[in-house]
A protein has these predicted regions:
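N-terminal presequence-like segments and the immediate start of the first folded domain
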Residues: 1-92, 96-110, 123-219
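Short glycine-rich or small-residue beta-strand-to-loop segments that form or flank ligand, phosphate
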Residues: 114-121
Length: 219
């Protein structure tokens, strides 16, 4: 782990014991490339990620799936698969938000704070499966960062720790031409957050002047 992680104020008993990237490779989760994923914020309506100097990282939501949800096993599986793809997308975004300037990476994630899942489904209590759909997102986070419902858990425990489990809201009754939108907040060491902000700002994608700076360092 990095010096940031090693110096973070978390109990020794709850420190992660594995390299996140080993799990990412085993799960065949694509991380893209610097050239395709580190881009300019010019003309953007929102940021993909915002870093706070406290160490909180807020990731904007993105959508997954193509069908509205219904109380049907096959339809819920479609939503869960879409939710898992959202998790993959946000993990990739977080990777570059932390790494593009050379300051940190996903091994610096201390723990996951809160997720919000919004499910496209009939309202008024007609559909009650929103939590099951959002599990596709949450359990992927468990698999990558550690958690009791991930692919590496046995008998309800992950020997790698609990950094992926999080508080969560899962709500149905939303409209849209997709299945689910999910956003998440994670915690990194405050020292790392401050170094990133001082080096290239608090936004990802990057403002043009900061993108030029990071590209010059990357060459």
């Amino acid at each position: 782990m990095s010096k940031y992680y090693d110096e973070a104020l978390i109990p020794a008993e709850m420190r992660r014991t594995f390299d996140v990237y080993d799990r990412i490779r085993a799960l065949q989760l694509p991380l893209g490339s610097f050239e395709t994923d580190v881009v300019s914020l010019a003309n953007a309506g929102i940021a993909g990620a915002v870093l706070h100097d406290s160490g909180l990282v807020y990731l904007s939501g993105t959508t997954g799936g193509t069908l509205p949800m219904a109380d049907d096993e096959e339809r819920i599986k479609h939503g869960q698969d879409g939710a898992q793809k959202i998790a993959d997308t946000l993990i990739k975004r977080l990777h570059w938000a932390l790494r593009c300037g050379g300051e940190g990476d996903l091994n610096d994630v201390l723990y996951t704070v809160k997720a919000l899942g919004m499910v496209v489904s009939p309202g008024g209590g007609a559909f009650r499966g929103a939590p099951a759909v959002v599990n596709g997102f949450s359990f992927r986070w468990h698999s990558v960062f550690g958690g009791p419902r991930g692919d590496y858990a046995q008998n309800g425990l992950d020997a790698g720790g609990f950094a992926g489990i999080h508080a969560r809201s899962a709500l149905g009754g939303f409209d849209g031409r997709f299945s689910i939108e999910t956003e998440i907040i994670v915690a990194i060491p405050s020292a790392l957050a401050r170094d990133i902000i001082q080096n290239r700002g608090w936004l990802f994608p990057l403002p043009p002047v900061m993108l030029d700076k990071v590209k010059a360092l990357h060459r």
